[in-house]
Amino acid sequence: MEALLEGIQNRGHGGGFLTSCEAELQELMKQIDIMVAHKKSEWEGRTHALETCLKIREQELKSLRSQLDVTHKEVGMLHQQVEEHEKIKQEMTMEYKQELKKLHEELCILKRSYEKLQKKQMREFRGNTKNHREDRSEIERLTAKIEEFRQKSLDWEKQRLIYQQQVSSLEAQRKALAEQSEIIQAQLVNRKQKLESVELSSQSEIQHLSSKLERANDTICANELEIERLTMRVNDLVGTSMTVLQEQQQKEEKLRESEKLLEALQEEKRELKAALQSQENLIHEARIQKEKLQEKVKATNTQHAVEAIRPREESLAEKKYTSQGQGDLDSVLSQLNFTHTSEDLLQAEVTCLEGSLESVSATCKQLSQELMEKYEELKRMEAHNNEYKAEIKKLKEQILQGEQSYSSALEGMKMEISHLTQELHQRDITIASTKGSSSDMEKRLRAEMQKAEDKAVEHKEILDQLESLKLENRHLSEMVMKLELGLHEAKEISLADLQENYIEALNKLVSENQQLQKDLMNTKSQLEISTQMCKKQNDRIFKPTHSRTTEFKNTEFKPTHGQHRHDGIKTEHYKTDLHSPRGQASDSINPMSRVLSPLSPQISPCSSTRSLTSYSLCKTHSLPSALDTNEANFSDTMSESMNDQEEFISSCSLPVSPLGSIATRFLEEEELRSHHILERLDAHIEELKRESEKTVRQFTALK
């Protein structure tokens, strides 16, 4: 094209003029070159941009695949951590089950030992009941054993209460752990569901994105194929344009040759014109001469007759001259005909060249139309590429959002797992602290039991003092009875002496009663101080409510007035047989009340001392049962044990029943109590086993 343009320009400069077709063709060639160069640069830039976009997308796909692999690895690690936590929980449940089995075995051993002891006691009691009438020493030994068994039963009751406390604490811990495990299981199920939903959504999004990427790849491949097809078409068009350029060059060469021929013909034409002009000049001169000659002939026609020889000669000369002019004219005419034919040929060649130029212009128009169509197709491709870019951006944003949601979900799961591990660690710490606190509680209870035993020893000493006072009161009552008998027998004694003796005896009794009241008040203050100390310690340990303790104190073991009006011999017999501190107190107080009741109303504080001693003794008896008033889970067992204790004390306070019936009743009540306690413990252990099995099943079901 450039060579053709240069040739046309050179021709224009050389020839000095350009036709309109050549100028239009030059402009078209320039526009075609500019458009082809512009489209070529645009296509190169677009192909380079598409290649860079494809490379960037491939890198993004690689990064996304690597991120997906990392997320899959993190999910696997999380699954492993969850499995490890489940294994740890299973191990903890197995340890708890083993501990429960050990406790059950220990309880079974205790049951067996207790049953053996009961059997031995029954055997010994049967053997002793057979030989009771024979040996009083055997009865005392049996009573001592009964007291020992009673103390053991109290110890067992204390141990039972301790075990009940431990079992209640374990049950509370187990319930709390079960609730927490259920909560954790629900949270884990929710988290698993969330993870599954997130995984499903991520998989669906990944599949959707992969399908979109496949579609984009297909569209890219189709675009590449279209680009290749367009490049092929462009190459074909370039080839056709090159062929057209070659044809144009050939035609330009032909035009140059024709132009050269035209120039040569024009020169020949000019020469011929010059020759024609010269011939015309000659012909004109000849005509002028001919006219002159004709004039001369006309002038000489008159002289023709005269001079006949001269006209003939002149005519011959004219004929010769005209023959020569006609030959010259024929040659000039032949040259003119040749120039006309050459002009016609040149015009035909020019028309052919114009037709070829028209065909070339038509082909150029077609090429321009095809280029415009290709430009429109390129615009469409650009629009499609922009749409694809927008879709790819949307896909990238969706992938980033999915990754962010997945990462946030993973971070939330990690935080929850760390929180759960911290909670489990805190629970382990609380379990260890509860174990330590239970051991401390056991130590405190043992110390309190020792203090209670020391106080019981002090109470026994006080009761011994009361026995001595009782003996003195009996001695005084005997003296008073003797005085009354002496009053009836000795009538000669004056009333004044009797009144004086009576007043002196009353004063002695009043002083002794005042001394006894002081001693009892001192003991009462000491007992109140000791009970307050015990109450404070029990409040620190067990935190009982004041209302329950007051009701328990007011309703527990209140002696009736009719229970202390039995025969003194029977109470002494019961006291010596069972060594009951309640019987001792009632025996020590009843003679004073019998002696001093008909004498004066001033000796009524003995009833207060009696109630005080009974209250203090009831305190000593009710101390093991008052330790666990705050336990709501074992209120039924506590009420039953308190009823059993009240029945036992009421049975002990009845001095009418003989020794054998009391012992058999005591043993039967102890057997019933122990059997009932063992049944409750077995039922509670079975419930714990069932609940532990439920928790284990739940954990296994979660797996």
From Swiss-Prot:
Modification after translation, per record: Polyubiquitinated via 'Lys-48'-linked ubiquitin, leading to its degradation. Deubiquitinated by USP36, promoting its stabilization.
Record's subcellular location: Cytoplasm, Cytoskeleton, Microtubule organizing center, Centrosome; Cytoplasm, Cytoskeleton, Microtubule organizing center, Centrosome, Centriole; Cytoplasm, Cytoskeleton, Microtubule organizing center, Centrosome, Centriolar satellite
Modified residues (N-acetylmethionine): 1
Keywords: Acetylation, Cell cycle, Cell division, Coiled coil, Cytoplasm, Cytoskeleton, DNA damage, Dwarfism, Host-virus interaction, Intellectual disability, Mitosis, Phosphoprotein, Ubl conjugation
Coiled-coil region(s): 22-199, 242-306, 353-533, 676-703
Main function: Required for normal spindle assembly. Plays a key role in mother-centriole-dependent centriole duplication; the function seems also to involve CEP152, CDK5RAP2 and WDR62 through a stepwise assembled complex at the centrosome that recruits CDK2 required for centriole duplication. Reported to be required for centrosomal recruitment of CEP152; however, this function has been questioned. Also recruits CDK1 to centrosomes. Plays a role in DNA damage response.
Main location: cytoplasm
Name under which the protein is recorded: Centrosomal protein of 63 kDa
GO molecular function: molecular adaptor activity
Subunit organization: Interacts with CEP152 and CDK1; these interactions recruit both ligands to centrosomes. Interacts with CDK2, CDK5RAP2, WDR62, CEP90, KIAA0753/moonraker and CCDC14. CEP63, CDK5RAP2, CEP152, WDR62 are proposed to form a stepwise assembled complex at the centrosome forming a ring near parental centrioles. Interacts with CCDC57; the interaction is required for their location to proximal end of centrioles. Interacts with FXR1; promoting its stabilization.
UniProt similarity note: Belongs to the CEP63 family.
Record: disease: Seckel syndrome 6: A rare autosomal recessive disorder characterized by proportionate dwarfism of prenatal onset associated with low birth weight, growth retardation, severe microcephaly with a bird-headed like appearance, and intellectual disability.
GO cellular component: centriolar satellite; centriole; centrosome; ciliary basal body; cytosol; nucleoplasm; spindle pole
PANTHER family reported for this sequence: CENTROSOMAL PROTEIN OF 63 KDA (PTHR18875:SF7), SARCOMA ANTIGEN NY-SAR-24/CYTOSKELETAL PROTEIN SOJO (PTHR18875)
Additional record remark: CEP63 and DEUP1 paralogs are both involved in centriole amplification: while CEP63 mediates mother-centriole-dependent centriole duplication, DEUP1 mediates de novo centriole amplification in multiciliated cells.
